[in-house]
């Protein structure tokens, strides 16, 4: 038999029974330092981020600021003018010649000068990437190694964002704390030791380490960058000037060291502290978008030098900002006594049990919401693209009350409308808005071009983003938001689709072309994974874009009717809606990804873009579209995985949860939680056991909300997809897509009790699919119609709902 207590870790760790008096109530802990940066804890305040490995004697922390994107150019280039090529492109597509279509598009892009931005890897042509957030600097904290180190533990407090590591050796107990303060906009580190026992060298490493992703080595963006490093007066200052070819941009990082006791001496890249009891390090990073010179450092140095550093007060400010947001929504599936288990222990339990560990899910729920809080500053989460990555990273924000964070996501797109109009005009000769798929804090212009990834032919990008704005309207009922921010944008999106989908097929329906279904077919790891004959991605009638266009038009019409405006235009939009292409089924009755009869399906593909109407959309439910529900259950189950990237598995899981296909939902969730996508700090990976990528991090709260309660206008469904083994739990704070809020719900094998508040006067259908379920409101049993009952709410009314199984 295996003695699990004897599993080897770098240091003897604090046992479970001793953690109850150490760990904060809401925390995620680890029993070993990170061996690679992917297992660091990460925290931030929106603008600033810091990650820590927790290594006692060789700690190296990475610091950055949200605006430090590697510059690609001084001014974003205009997209190529494809208008002269469009008639020929469309003719070739209708004639079934996608390869010639791709060649023609490729020629047009290269003539416009975009070939210099493309990258070749394994004979696959990649477009230029989005600007990449880079590290401002690394700080190394080097202490004398001790052979008798024990009682190790590190954790992240999700109520205030503080990362802590503790250990003991012959010299006594040591501790390191790190957080990014909202007050003062600084990163704070504090190293504590027994009196007079802190000996530490603090040294800086500037940016410029090589970056490699798979077989691709990214070009060094700092070839022409220059910097100035000064170490004096207890302060390390890095002034960094970017390539002057890209404008006079740069940043200043000032790092102030405040030892308590002992001595401090200058060393080559920092300071050496001897015989101290405590060391506080305060760092400030400021980006300059123009007129940068090394002289800019003085103002930053002066500001930091004048700052009154009160560690506890700064931490209290974080508790107020983060803690209040975290307390808005919680889920409790696991046992209270298990909350002190480490990520390593929780993963070991879920790997050895037949079910996903409930406490692991509780902590992933917290981690997902904490991620959106600390990652949102002037910019929203920005890792990946807007074709599923960022969408997943924020997808639980509306339901769990992170409205300030969601507004940053909304405004990020709203500020780029002029660029979106340019995209629509030059790429398709259309009026209206065409959003860019890539994340760029400075520009919404399309520059993401290659034959392999024709994302500019994915016309639904902005519609998916606006699914979240519409979701905000559904949970709040904010009609001013509807009037001023939704309707004007939807009108321009509808205008784009009117011009883009202007030709008609043999059935009289409009044609979406050239069209791209993200990202089909994708060459990862190679085209040998593609199951259809053609590997050319530019095609006709992607179902995703048809679904998004339908959602745009439907929401536009409904919104205008609600406001009593634009009545003269509604018949035009209704005609546009009626002219959309009809979906097609394959031989098994599964929904096809392309609504064009001659296009073959590629089943081994990591995206399920054509399931948009189920999630994130709400057009298809078992009640509203039973036949399409069955078709999507089939297509969801048939999907291969291509390259094991998380986002496709996530979308399949969310599709299955919405359709109440429990076997498929749990199979996909099991793969995500058990097979290398969750790291021991409970951060997530894009590929199993490789790196950190937050798609799953942002999506887990959505999983658990949707399993607990489904909502759409006029409908609230309780426990729609909760597996039997999780039939003891509770959830607090879920904003519902019908201007209502689930204040609290708890459940067991006998039934559920919920507190529900309606933000408006409305009659709600209350549903529970459990066999024989009865529904009571305020102690009065309601008449059932199948699995549902109705109740007429007054505006602001809060009721007790009881469901008996």
What do the predicted segments below correspond to?
Residues 461-472, 485-499, 648, 652, ...:
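Extended, hydrophobic alpha-helical segments in both membrane/secreted and soluble proteins
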Residues 450, 457-463, 475:
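Extracellular/periplasmic, surface-exposed regions of secreted and cell-surface proteins
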Residues 81, 353-356, 360, 401, ...:
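Extracytoplasmic/periplasmic, Sec-exported soluble proteins
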Residues 378-383, 482-484, 502-513, 565-572:
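Short, glycine/acidic-rich hinge or "gate" loops at secondary-structure transitions
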Residues 2-449, 453, 471-473, 491-494, ...:
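Aromatic-residue-lined binding/catalytic grooves and analogous aromatic/hydrophobic interfacial grooves
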Residues 478-479:
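Short loop-to-helix capping motifs
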Residues 37-68, 72, 119, 384, ...:
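C-terminal capping/lid segments that line or modulate ligand- or cofactor-binding pockets
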């Amino acid at each position: 038999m295996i003695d699990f207590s004897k599993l080897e870790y770098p240091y003897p760790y604090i046992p479970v029974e001793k953690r109850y008096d150490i760990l904060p109530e809401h925390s995620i802990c680890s029993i070993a330092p990170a061996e690679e940066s992917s297992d660091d804890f990460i925290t931030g305040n929106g603008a600033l981020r810091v990650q820590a490995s927790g290594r006692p004697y060789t700690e190296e922390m990475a610091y950055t600021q949200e605006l430090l994107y590697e510059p690609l150019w001084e001014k974003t280039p205009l997209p190529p003018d494809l208008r002269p090529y469009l008639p020929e492109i469309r003719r070739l597509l209708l004639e079934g010649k996608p390869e010639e279509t791709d060649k023609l598009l490729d020629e047009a892009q290269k003539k416009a000068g975009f070939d210099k931005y493309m990258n070749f890897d394994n004979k696959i042509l990649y477009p230029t990437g989005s600007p990449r957030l880079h590290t401002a600097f690394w700080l190394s904290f080097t202490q004398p190694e001790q052979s008798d180190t024990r009682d190790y533990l590190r954790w992240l407090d999700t109520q205030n964002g503080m990362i802590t590591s503790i250990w003991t050796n012959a010299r006594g107990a040591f501790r390191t704390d790190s957080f990014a303060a909202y007050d003062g906009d600084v990163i704070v580190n504090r190293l504590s030791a027994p009196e007079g026992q802190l000996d530490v060298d603090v040294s800086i490493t500037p940016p410029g380490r090589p970056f490699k992703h798979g077989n691709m080595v990214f070009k060094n963006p700092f070839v022409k960058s220059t910097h100035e490093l000064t170490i004096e007066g207890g302060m390390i200052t890095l002034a960094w000037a970017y390539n002057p070819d890209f404008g006079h941009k740069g940043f200043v990082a000032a790092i102030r060291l405040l030892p308590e006791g002992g001595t401090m001496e200058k060393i080559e890249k920092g300071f050496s502290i001897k015989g101290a009891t405590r060391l506080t390090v305060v760092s400030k990073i400021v980006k300059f978008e123009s007129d940068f010179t090394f002289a800019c450092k003085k103002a930053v140095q002066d500001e930091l030098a004048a700052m009154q550093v009160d560690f506890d007060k700064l931490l209290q400010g974080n508790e107020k900002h983060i803690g209040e947001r975290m307390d808005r929504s919680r889920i409790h599936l696991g046992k209270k006594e298990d909350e002190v288990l480490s990520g390593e222990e929780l993963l070991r339990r879920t790997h050895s049990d037949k079910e996903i560990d409930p406490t692991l899910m509780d902590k992933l729920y917290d981690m997902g919401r904490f991620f959106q809080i600390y990652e949102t500053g002037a910019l929203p989460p920005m890792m990946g693209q807007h074709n599923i990555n960022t969408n997943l990273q924020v997808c639980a924000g509306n339901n769990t009350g992170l409205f300030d964070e969601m507004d940053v996501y909304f405004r990020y797109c709203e500020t780029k409308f002029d660029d979106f109009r340019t995209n629509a005009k030059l790429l398709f000769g259309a009026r209206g808005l065409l959003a860019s798929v890539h994340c760029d804090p400075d520009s919404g212009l399309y520059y993401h071009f290659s034959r392999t990834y024709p994302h500019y032919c994915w016309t639904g990008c902005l519609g998916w983003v606006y699914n979240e704005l519409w979701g905000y309207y559904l949970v709040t009922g904010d009609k001013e938001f509807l009037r001023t921010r939704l309707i004007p944008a939807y009108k321009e999106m509808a205008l784009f689709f009117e011009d883009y989908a202007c030709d008609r097929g043999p059935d009289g329906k409009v044609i979406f072309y050239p069209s791209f279904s993200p990202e089909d077919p994708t060459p990862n790891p190679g085209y040998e994974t593609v199951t259809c004959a053609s590997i050319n991605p530019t095609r006709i009638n992607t179902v995703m874009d048809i679904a998004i266009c339908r959602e745009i038009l439907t929401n536009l019409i409904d919104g205008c009717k609600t406001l009593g405006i634009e009545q003269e235009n509604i018949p035009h939009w209704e005609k546009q809606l009626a002219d959309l292409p009809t979906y097609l089924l394959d031989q098994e009755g599964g929904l096809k990804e392309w609504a064009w009869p001659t296009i073959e399906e590629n089943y081994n593909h990591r995206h399920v873009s054509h399931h948009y109407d189920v999630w994130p959309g709400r057009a298809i439910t078992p009640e509203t579209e039973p036949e399409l529900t069955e078709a999507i259950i089939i297509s969801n189950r048939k999907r291969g995985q291509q390259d094991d990237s998380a986002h496709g598995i996530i979308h399949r899981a969310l599709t299955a949860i919405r359709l109440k296909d429990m076997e498929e939902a749990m199979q996909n969730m099991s793969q995500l939680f058990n097979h290398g996508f969750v790291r021991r700090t409970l951060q997530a990976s894009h590929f199993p056991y490789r790196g950190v990528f937050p798609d799953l991090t942002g999506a887990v709260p959505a999983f658990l909300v949707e399993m607990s309660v489904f909502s759409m206008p006029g409908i609230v469904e309780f426990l729609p997809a909760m597996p039997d083994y999780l039939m003891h739990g509770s959830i607090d704070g879920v904003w519902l897509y019908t201007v209502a809020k689930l204040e609290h719900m708890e459940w067991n094998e006998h039934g559920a009790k919920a507190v529900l508040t309606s933000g408006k006067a409305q009659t709600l259908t209350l549903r529970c699919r459990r066999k024989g379920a009865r529904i009571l409101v305020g102690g009065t049993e309601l008449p059932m119609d199948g699995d549902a009952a109705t109740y007429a709410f007054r505006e602001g009314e809060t009721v007790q709902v009881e469901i008996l199984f």
